[in-house]
């Protein structure tokens, strides 16, 4: 008998094992990829969450605090704290929206864009190198499609 609680879902042992393996492998992949980004961030005097904000702003341009929180998967309060740190460092600036006094947009400063242009290619390069050592181009494309389906984005 297994030492875990059975769920209401009636999965076969094989389906349950597959589900657990997929979950654990996704979590391992997340940890591995985040550590690569963290190493680049730390080598530039930043925390991973700060680098994540810089990456999102570098890719999307000025965006609202709410969208920034959603894109970075950071809680709104932690997003605010991270943006404040980056603002004090001169890497981002906040501005009230022209459409709403309540909405605040965040953008990279010139110095923030320099950090983005320096770090983003390194992160992408390390991630790509890791994946390319293990997967063919076709497998990478298949992984992209399957993960997109898994998170509800359909085909990328």
Where are these regions (language model features)?
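N-terminal helix-turn-helix DNA-binding core of bacterial DNA-binding proteins
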Residues: 31-75
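N-terminal leader segment of winged-helix/HTH proteins
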Residues: 1-44, 108
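Charged, amphipathic alpha-helical coiled-coil/dimerization segments
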Residues: 4, 8, 34, 84-142
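Residues within helix-turn-helix
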Residues: 65-66, 77, 84, 104
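C-terminal regulatory/oligomerization modules of transcriptional regulators
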Residues: 1-14, 137-156
